[in-house]
Amino acid sequence: MAAQTLDDLPTPALILDRAILRRNLKRMSDRLRDAGVALRPHLKTAKSVEIGRMAVEGHDGRITVSTLAEARYFADGGFSDILYGVGIVPSKLPAVAELRRRGVNLRCVTDNVAVARAIAGAARAGDTFSVFIEIDSGAGRAGLPWPDLPGLLDIARILHEAPGVELAGVMTHAGHSYHESTPDGLAAVAEQERRAIVGAAERLRQAGIPCPIVSAGSTPTAVHSRNFAGINEMRPGVYVFNDLDQEFIGSCAPTDLALSVLASVIGHYPHRNQMLIDAGALALSKDISAQEFKPQVGFGTIVDAPVRDMAVVACSQEHGFVGAGEPIPYGNLPVGSRVRILPNHACITAAAYDRYYVVDSELDGGRSVVGTYDRINGW
């Protein structure tokens, strides 16, 4: 690739600071290694083989994905222990089986008796499966709700007794951690998550059913947990990049945000103290998660803004409306100049792009493009 700077790139473009990425990866890697907990990073955020390889460096290589397209992509990239972390349906079992026949230990997830029976039936036809039972530790999304765990033993027995099926363990995701913003509050959610998933594992073991893997994880609970006892695997994801939401809930510092969107200024509107950029809803997403804690961030904040509270305050499909808490100095930001926007939710913002343009703030302040990483999108 010919030498490029940020000024040479088409806009909008997805910019990744490699130096910050590496620091984020090392911080989580060291934390879980010191705790004696296996790291299975959730690569739905990065969706990149290059970043995935960096994330598992020094660990055993296990990963989590959220689509079958990701599973195929990472399998082609050499990953062999992959958890497909979205509840499986019978129509997708042939795709799982196909990857497993290639030697990939693609594991699936269920919280449903009928699906467990379908998995057992597919195994009787000659395929093999590795399955986690999903537990709801308080997020209210998927999983058997703790503490009642209705159907846990029925599902577990179907899977455990089926030839060709491995009951890999139990897993949970404390998604409600994203609504806390104090260390004590986040630690409390992490402990709730731990008690639920360890309790589910103990219930299986008391019934004589093995439960090898006890898997939990979100970035906030991985960062703020004060007790990993009984958990032997964590699945954080957004920690690789971080974002405004993670900053505001206290999972990272402002200097830990590795991802931004590069956009061009396309119009000045001083009568309303706004300017337009060519990054709108499709380039940034309309995720407003960070507004729960700091409403003025809008749909993303401007990096190195010349005035206070400069942010994307509204979006249409391809237009971003930039406002500020003070008069915008338009002379500093002429039409055609570039700005970078920090996203509210890195996972959703990154999903619009097919590649990362990689910079390194430790080399030249992050002005030069030092490479690209590809991404997998779709399902």
Q: Predicted segment positions?
A:
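Active-site-proximal beta-alpha core segment in soluble small-molecule metabolic enzymes
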Residues: 42-179
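Generic N-terminal amphipathic, Lys/Arg-enriched alpha-helix
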Residues: 1-16
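Active-site loop/helix belt of alpha/beta enzymes
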Residues: 137-253
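Active-site loop ensemble at the mouth of alpha/beta enzyme cores that anchors a bound cofactor
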Residues: 188, 221-301
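N-terminal glycine-rich anion-binding loops that anchor highly charged ligand groups
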Residues: 20-51, 62-64
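Conserved, mostly hydrophobic/aromatic
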Residues: 21, 44, 74, 133, ...
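C-terminal accessory subdomain/extension
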Residues: 270-379
